[in-house]
Amino acid sequence: MAEENNARTLTGKVVSDKMDKSVVVQIERRVRHPIYDKYVKRSTKLHAHDEANQARVGDTVSIEECRPISKLKAWTLVEVVEQAKG
């Protein structure tokens, strides 16, 4: 029987690639303020495993949740959706 992949997938922008086989991805979301009814940008930074060191700063990437790889890394790079210009 085939196992289903129920892992969460997120898309974000690479903000750091200084580590070996690791990147930091910033995920932005919009949240409605409960009092002012205005939508505010909120962001989360996640450390992701990049086995091939293919992501660069500014790239838009897709990451997937996985088993904990280290103290900070529990996500892995799936693909580079869009490369940074320049």
UniProtKB/Swiss-Prot annotation:
InterPro entries cross-referenced by the UniProt entry: NA-bd_OB-fold, Ribosomal_uS17, Ribosomal_uS17_bact/chlr, Ribosomal_uS17_CS
GO biological process entries: translation
User: Pfam families in the record, alphabetically?
Assistant: Ribosomal_S17
Spell out the disulfide connections: none
GO MF annotation list: rRNA binding; structural constituent of ribosome
Q: Which GO terms describe its cellular component?
A: cytosolic small ribosomal subunit
Identify the keywords attached in UniProt to this record, alphabetized.
Ribonucleoprotein, Ribosomal protein, RNA-binding, rRNA-binding
Question: Which HAMAP family does the record cross-reference, listed alphabetically?
Answer: Ribosomal_uS17_B
Q: Which family does it belong to?
A: Belongs to the universal ribosomal protein uS17 family.
Describe its function.
Answer: One of the primary rRNA binding proteins, it binds specifically to the 5'-end of 16S ribosomal RNA.
Q: How does it assemble?
A: Part of the 30S ribosomal subunit.
Q: What is this protein called?
A: Small ribosomal subunit protein uS17
Q: What organism is this sequence from?
A: Chromohalobacter salexigens (strain ATCC BAA-138 / DSM 3043 / CIP 106854 / NCIMB 13768 / 1H11)
